[in-house]
Amino acid sequence: MRYVMFICGDADHSADDAAAAPEIEDWFTYANERGQYVQGVRLQDLDQARTVRVRDGELLVTDGPYTEAREWIAGFGIIECDTFEEAVELARRNPMAWEGRIELRPIHSMGGPND
């Protein structure tokens, strides 16, 4: 099953946790050796974000995701694991679990060729 890892920055992380975090290169090696890494991207900073909504037929575009965000989506990864527990273990090894947080969600199959 595929899972999305929402990689979230967190302004409240501790310096000790960040210092103890594993290296990202080690995580990529670990995930790739097991065939669990599918793809991922790092997002540009919050000042490049726009929020788009349509309300009552009117387009509303605002700068940034939220005002004074303490947490933000910094990127995402797609992983493939046999169980949710395996996905949690893989996410635990990612340095962003130490420096921010990772939200895991199973990906709903849409029946496309890449599912």
Task: For the regions a language model picked out, list residue spans one by one.
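Conserved, structured core segments of small domains
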Residues: 1-115
